[in-house]
Amino acid sequence: MTNRILPLAVLVATLAGGAHAQSYTLTPLSSFGGDGWLAPGEGGISYLGTANNERGFAYNPTSNNLLLVSRTGGLSIKVLDGMTGADEGALNQGTGVITGGTFTGSTIGVAGDGAIYMANLAGPVGGASAFKVYRWANEAAASPTVAYSSTSITAGRLGDSLDVFGSGSGTLLVAGESNTGSGGSGPRNGYAVLSTANGLDYSGTLVTFTGTPPNAGDHRLGLTFIDSNSVMGTVGGNWRLSDFSGAAGTLVDSSPTSSASERAMDYATIGGIGYLATLDTASSLVRIYDMSDPNNPSLVTSGNATSGTLSANGNGTGQVQFGTISGNSATIYAMSSNQGIQAMTFTVVPEPEEYAMMAAGGLIAFGVWRRFRR
């Protein structure tokens, strides 16, 4: 009797397990730029070029727009329609508010309530160049405010990477630290976390690590919150997953990236599962990983909406962002500097219903067999 029970039990387990399998698609959002790609200079636009002047953009969940920091012809923060890529204008900069830094505007992020945060690039941070973060209450704000300014949080470089988590008084910002030729001594392997009690004014803490890795600059070119006290970063080559408490960082995992030029990243939850989107800054290839086990990211799909010969991105800068998430689908935007902005739709496709029915049928057959066994 034992020999007869085992095959049926194995069959039922196999069918039941198969009911949880799924596939994935990543396809260009054809309404965006006409083919899923807003190429540099497309349609005569000047604010998206090939001169290393566009390094950061963000998705605004309250407007479905993109916010692009461009230094072409002077600083502007362009507002682009998230479905089409059409130019919707620019944020108001006020008068005399945005000043200082190696670049006055570099990277940008948006909180869940629509508040917009733009960081300058300061390298090194010091008396001659404060690290600043500016805040707009929304896209219609008449002027930004200075949400954070420091000349002493680090003697290294800040502003190449930025991520935003939460909203209101629970908003957190993180910026990756790196070393510079004149930035003093120290490991420069951490990141600055900015927090607020009122949603307007921020204080900063430099999170540092004992020993290496992380190595200097390991959070410089890619950085994302996983949750309110965990981040993942990279400069290319390895991801550094870490937890932080106050100023103390703890390295949790160092998984290798799929390529040395895989850098920009963003994390989101879709259908109850965490996913990591990354961008290869050499080829503009977008990769998606299942993060059910954060210590072992599993590549599920990849895609690229660009075409032809791309301009080089020697600085390895850029940004990738999850956009609208609905059910098992999400829009993903990606920009490798000098290579335009892509928009794609990522879909988690559940196992077809008939497989679940087969699993249920297997359980019924097993019950019938048990009932009438001799």
Name these PLM-found stretches:
Residues S23-G43, D87-G96, A142-T154, L200-T212, ...:
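Beta-propeller fold detector
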Residues D81, G85-D113:
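Blade-loop segments of beta-propeller domains
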Residues S254-G303:
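Loop/turn-rich, solvent-exposed surfaces of beta-rich toroidal or solenoidal domains
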Residues T72-S76, A122-G127, S178-S185, N238-W239, ...:
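Short glycine/acidic-enriched loop and turn motifs that connect beta-strands
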Residues E351-W369:
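A short, hydrophobic C-terminal helix/tail in secreted or cell-surface proteins
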Residues S311-V348:
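Blade-level signature of beta-propeller repeat domains, shared across WD40, Kelch, NHL, RCC1
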Residues G41-A58, V97-G109, I153-G166, G176, ...:
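Signature of short aromatic-glycine-proline-rich micro-motifs recurring in repeat-based ectodomains
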Residues Y59-S63, V110-D113, G166-S169, F225-S228, ...:
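Residue-level detector of Asp-centered blade-edge/turn motifs that repeat once per structural unit
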